[in-house]
Design a protein with these regions (language model features):
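Juxtamembrane intracellular "pre-TM" segments in multi-pass secondary transporters
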Residues: 183-216, 410-419
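Cytoplasmic helix-loop-helix junction between adjacent transmembrane helices
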Residues: 99-138
Length: 419
């Protein structure tokens, strides 16, 4: 029971992180009025969030290995609360951007810290499913931003809505401080201070493990498409290029969340029971993404609604698919450097998403703005990422398997010699 209480408390902190991550997205029009910002400036908030989140992953992983989950979850909640209360009270655009960066920093340390709790508190056979459930349940934060937060925003205004979110974050911080413990044996104690050279050597060692890179390319190839779709270009594509109403586009994003939840449960069970087939599951998910996008983009005109539904469902499976990358990191890294490895894995999809978002924006501008033909060309940027990711998976998978066999043979030899 204690393990479930600790995981649930960490999960609440992650739900708040997703809530904080998505509040600005649902309040975009209000933000435009409050900060006198046009569409390009508003998109800066999204890009800034991704840049800070991705850039902070390796430092967050190093801090996680040094100080443990409890310290980082509490710190992350405090940073996000500080950023949200600043957004609540300011009408200065530069200050709002700075506050958004602080929110992104707090968000960056939270997810991997909650994931780190799972292998410490649960038996190995449950870890894959609980890893999936962590990612899945965290998406309830998006529901909170879309329903109660938006309702408060509409009825009570900007400041009240953002202060309410700040209060929720403060609650998560207090509960994490009171209830979360790093391991059953007590808290993680800080190791000796590392020099800059020592830190870089540690990062290099973790990255050179084939399992870490396998997780990185897994996260890259599965997660970026749905992230780009949900965070920036999905709604404009559905409404302008495909001719759907805003209501219909919102309904498809709801379908995306349901599809991700359903796929996550199934994938968690499968990866737990068939751990040696994890990379095949990942390759199938990437192949399905490539196939459905090829079908949609090959059409000379707008796609029928049923095909767009299939598109959204298929790319949404990439969200839980990316969680397999963290399972690779856990399998091929010792506990002492697991945080660093998970941070590296988490960079993969977000770096790819950032590059695709920026590249698509440049292509859309070059082709005269939002149109069916412009989007049709812009979405093809994804194929470059898929090619890189699949190549990386195939190469690192072979190296990881050889490393595992060598370690098993070494273990057997040591056992034989000891007997």
């Amino acid at each position: 029971m204690r393990a479930w209480i600790i995981w649930s408390t960490g999960l609440l902190a992650y739900i708040v992180a997703v809530l904080d991550r998505t509040t600005l997205g649902v309040s975009g029009l209000d933000a435009a009025d409050r900060f006198s910002a046009g569409p390009s400036v508003l998109s800066t908030f999204v890009v800034l969030q991704v840049v800070v989140y991705a850039g902070a992953q390796v430092p967050a992983g190093l801090l996680l290995d040094r100080y443990g989950s409890r310290v980082l979850i509490v710190t992350g909640a405090a940073l996000m609360a500080a950023g949200q209360v600043t957004l609540a009270l300011t009408d200065s655009l530069p200050l709002a951007l700075g506050a958004r960066a602080i929110v992104g920093l707090g968000d960056a340390v939270t997810f991997i810290s909650v994931l780190r709790l799972v292998p410490h508190w649960f038996p190995p056979r449950r870890v894959p499913l609980l890893t999936q459930l962590t990612g899945i349940c965290g998406q309830f934060g998006q529901v909170l931003s879309a329903i109660p937060f938006l309702a408060i925003l509409a009825s009570a205004g900007w400041a009240t809505a953002y202060v309410s979110v700040t209060a929720f974050g403060a609650l998560a911080m207090v509960l994490a401080f009171a209830l979360v413990r790093d391991t059953p044996r007590g808290r993680v104690r800080a190791t000796e201070t590392l020099t800059v050279r020592g830190t870089l050597a540690s990062v290099k060692t973790v990255w050179l493990r084939p399992g870490t890179r396998l997780g990185f390319f897994t996260h890259m190839g599965t997660q970026f498409s749905v992230t780009v779709f949900a965070l920036m270009w999905g709604v404009p594509y559905l409404t302008v290029a495909q001719g759907l109403s805003t209501h219909a586009a919102g309904a498809l994003l709801t379908v995306s969340v349901v599809a991700a939840i359903s796929a996550g449960v199934v994938l968690g069970i499968l990866t737990g029971r068939l751990p040696h087939r994890r990379s095949w599951f990942v390759l199938i998910i990437i192949a399905s993404n490539v196939l459905i996008w090829t079908v949609v983009l090959a059409l000379p005109d707008r796609a029928p609604l049923w095909l767009l539904v299939v598109l959204v469902v298929v790319i949404s499976v990439g969200g839980p698919g990316s969680m397999v990358g963290f399972d690779f990191a856990r399998t091929f890294n010792p506990s002492a450097t697991l945080g660093t490895a998970q941070g590296m894995v988490n960079m993969g999809g977000f770096l790819a998403a950032l590059l695709v978002m920026q590249s698509m924006g440049a292509i859309l501008d070059a082709r005269g703005g939002y149109s069916f033909d412009a989007f049709r060309v812009a979405w093809t940027v994804q194929y470059v990422v898929w090619a890189v990711a699949v190549t990386g998976i195939l190469i690192t998978r072979g190296k990881a398997r050889r490393q595992m066999r060598a370690e098993q043979e070494r273990s057997l030899l040591e056992t034989f010699e000891a007997s």
